[in-house]
Amino acid sequence: MKCSLRLFEKAGRLSVRSQTVQTFQQRIVLANGASYLVNTTLPKPYILSIKDITNMPLNNPKVNALSSIRGQESRRSKFEERYEGL
């Protein structure tokens, strides 16, 4: 917990205002099971990351989700062949 004092002037007199920021350690768990700690102001102890670099199909080409992208490439090539001369 960090605590700092800040002086500010209000109606011609100085006052002391305390500004308190509480930080918590948070564990972020990636899709592949790896985790790391981050200091944050969110009081949640952990976050399960749904989308990260370990489960995105473009970053991890071994994932089966790329089959739909390959299917779109073949559809696009058929479309380009059909309307090539226009």
UniProtKB/Swiss-Prot annotation:
One of its GO terms (molecular function) is structural constituent of ribosome. It is found in: Mitochondrion. Residues 1-18 form a transit peptide. Induction: Differentially expressed during meiosis. One of its GO terms (cellular component) is mitochondrial large ribosomal subunit. Its main location: mitochondrion. GO terms for biological process: mitochondrial translation. Keywords: Mitochondrion, Ribonucleoprotein, Ribosomal protein, Transit peptide. It comes from the Eukaryota. InterPro entries: Ribosomal_bL31m. PANTHER family: 54S RIBOSOMAL PROTEIN L36, MITOCHONDRIAL (PTHR28174), LARGE RIBOSOMAL SUBUNIT PROTEIN BL31M (PTHR28174:SF1). Component of the mitochondrial large ribosomal subunit (mt-LSU). Mature yeast 74S mitochondrial ribosomes consist of a small (37S) and a large (54S) subunit. The 37S small subunit contains a 15S ribosomal RNA (15S mt-rRNA) and at least 32 different proteins. The 54S large subunit contains a 21S rRNA (21S mt-rRNA) and at least 45 different proteins. Belongs to the bacterial ribosomal protein bL31 family. Highly divergent. Component of the mitochondrial ribosome (mitoribosome), a dedicated translation machinery responsible for the synthesis of mitochondrial genome-encoded proteins, including at least some of the essential transmembrane subunits of the mitochondrial respiratory chain. The mitoribosomes are attached to the mitochondrial inner membrane and translation products are cotranslationally integrated into the membrane. This is Large ribosomal subunit protein bL31m. It comes from Schizosaccharomyces pombe (strain 972 / ATCC 24843) (Fission yeast).
